[in-house]
Amino acid sequence: MAKIQARTQNEGPEDGLREKMIAINRVTKVVKGGRILGFAALTVVGDGDGRVGMGKGKSKEVPAAVQKAMEEARRNLAKISIKNGTLHHRVTGHWGAASVVMIPAPKGTGIIAGGPMRAVFEVMGITDIVAKSHGSSNPYNMVRATLDGLKNSTTASEVAAKRGLTVEEIFA
């Protein structure tokens, strides 16, 4: 409880990371004596320069669930390569029944993406992208599919290194 109070007294996160809440669900556990109510929170955290992480937390109270989710998201940060506020190439991500297609866009396009995908792009610093989700609209599955696709993206220099060529030879 002291951690929650200390966090609410500060104006923002002290580590400079952007935080976004995606979903809070009320969950119940049925036991012999009745129902036990709880809350599950889904959050994303990013530094605005390509690092992004997702976390989920469960607790009997909303603030504690959110705090747990934020801490998990901070522990799970992954670095994604960004070029001029967008991706290097078109990528597809899958998780469960969710499928996400992300297409790089020219400067000035903005973030054209729905719900949970938009939050992921905002915290990681992508400013121009077009994204479409297919299949499951479950926020957890959509975020995991988005992160799966982002982790599968590569730069031209990474492809060149794998092939043993230079970047100029790849584009020639």
Curated annotation (Swiss-Prot):
Keywords assigned: Ribonucleoprotein, Ribosomal protein, RNA-binding, rRNA-binding
Gene3D superfamilies: 3.30.160.20, 3.30.230.10
GO MF assignments: rRNA binding; structural constituent of ribosome
Biological process, per Gene Ontology: translation
A Pfam short name: Ribosomal_S5_C
Domain S5 DRBM residues, every copy: 17-80
Listed GO CC annotations: small ribosomal subunit
Keyword Lipid biosynthesis in annotation: no
Superkingdom assignment: Bacteria
Entry-linked SUPFAM superfamilies: dsRNA-binding domain-like (SSF54768), Ribosomal protein S5 domain 2-like (SSF54211)
HAMAP family attached to this UniProt entry: Ribosomal_uS5_B
Entry's family note: Belongs to the universal ribosomal protein uS5 family.
The protein's assembly and partners: Part of the 30S ribosomal subunit. Contacts proteins S4 and S8.
Function: With S4 and S12 plays an important role in translational accuracy.
Domain statement: The N-terminal domain interacts with the head of the 30S subunit; the C-terminal domain interacts with the body and contacts protein S4. The interaction surface between S4 and S5 is involved in control of translational fidelity.
Name listed for the protein in its UniProt record: Small ribosomal subunit protein uS5
Organism listed in the record: Variovorax paradoxus (strain S110)
Gene expressing this chain: rpsE
